[in-house]
């Protein structure tokens, strides 16, 4: 509630914790496409958005459920899934002629190694330039899920029942969590081969 004559009531979306208008203005002034990354409890969402006179236009928009198309059996909200989502979004952006973008993480804290930066890394590896500092990018080991695999191996040896409970969803999908890094590489290879072929065909036309 306003408390004085000089008190300024924030914009509704800022009050609701949805939009940082100062940051958004800087992004819009750059005149570059925005790589918008958002999180839900179960999935990650990534979009390539272009500001138009009539409003924002989403030219690419996907969430991690798309990974099942390539046989992904891991969780859909972890670092590995975030990277793979970024990889697909990056390839789709290239197919639409987009060569660079600026990361827009909204009100998320820019914590080094966070999943939003794993999405960004995937987009970059697909061939789209995104300005960033190397210190925020998750390590290759973390992107591959090495930390999950190591923890799973240790837990399986020390507490088999706890292992089954902790990784029940992985096991139900037919993926032993200690095999996550190799599974990640298999899915990544499928994505790269699929989209590289599509891009090559588009160029050959």
From Swiss-Prot:
Identification of the protein by name: Large ribosomal subunit protein uL18
NCBIfam families per UniProt: PRK08569.1
SUPFAM superfamilies tied to this protein: Translational machinery components
GO cellular component: cytosolic large ribosomal subunit
GO biological process per UniProt: ribosomal large subunit assembly; translation
Keywords: Ribonucleoprotein, Ribosomal protein, RNA-binding, rRNA-binding
Keyword DNA-binding: no
Single GO MF annotation: 5S rRNA binding
Subunit structure and binding partners: Part of the 50S ribosomal subunit. Contacts the 5S and 23S rRNAs.
Gene symbol of the encoding locus: rpl18
Organism: Pyrobaculum calidifontis (strain DSM 21063 / JCM 11548 / VA1)
Record lineage: Archaea, Thermoproteota, Thermoprotei, Thermoproteales, Thermoproteaceae
Family: Belongs to the universal ribosomal protein uL18 family.
InterPro entries, alphabetized: Rbsml_uL18_euk
Role of this protein: This is one of the proteins that bind and probably mediate the attachment of the 5S RNA into the large ribosomal subunit, where it forms part of the central protuberance.
């Amino acid at each position: 509630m306003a408390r004085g004559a000089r008190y300024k009531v924030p914009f509704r979306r800022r009050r609701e914790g949805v939009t940082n208008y100062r940051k958004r203005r800087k992004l819009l002034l750059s005149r570059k496409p925005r790589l918008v990354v958002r999180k839900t409890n179960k999935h990650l969402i990534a979009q390539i958005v272009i500001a138009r006179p009539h409003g924002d236009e989403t030219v690419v928009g996907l969430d991690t459920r798309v990974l099942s198309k390539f046989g992904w059996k891991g969780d859909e909200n972890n670092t590995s899934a975030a990277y793979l989502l970024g990889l697909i979004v990056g390839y789709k952006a290239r197919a639409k002629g987009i060569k660079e973008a600026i990361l827009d993480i909204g009100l998320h804290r820019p914590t080094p190694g966070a999943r939003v930066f794993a999405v960004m890394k995937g987009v970059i590896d697909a061939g789209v330039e995104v300005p960033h500092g190397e210190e925020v990018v998750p390590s290759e080991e973390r992107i591959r899920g090495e930390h999950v695999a190591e923890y799973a191996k240790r837990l399986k040896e020390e507490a088999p029942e706890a292992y089954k409970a902790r990784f029940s969803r992985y096991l139900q999908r037919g993926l032993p969590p200690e095999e996550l890094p190799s599974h990640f590489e298999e899915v990544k290879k499928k994505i790269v081969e699929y989209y590289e072929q599509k891009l090559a065909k588009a160029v050959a036309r």
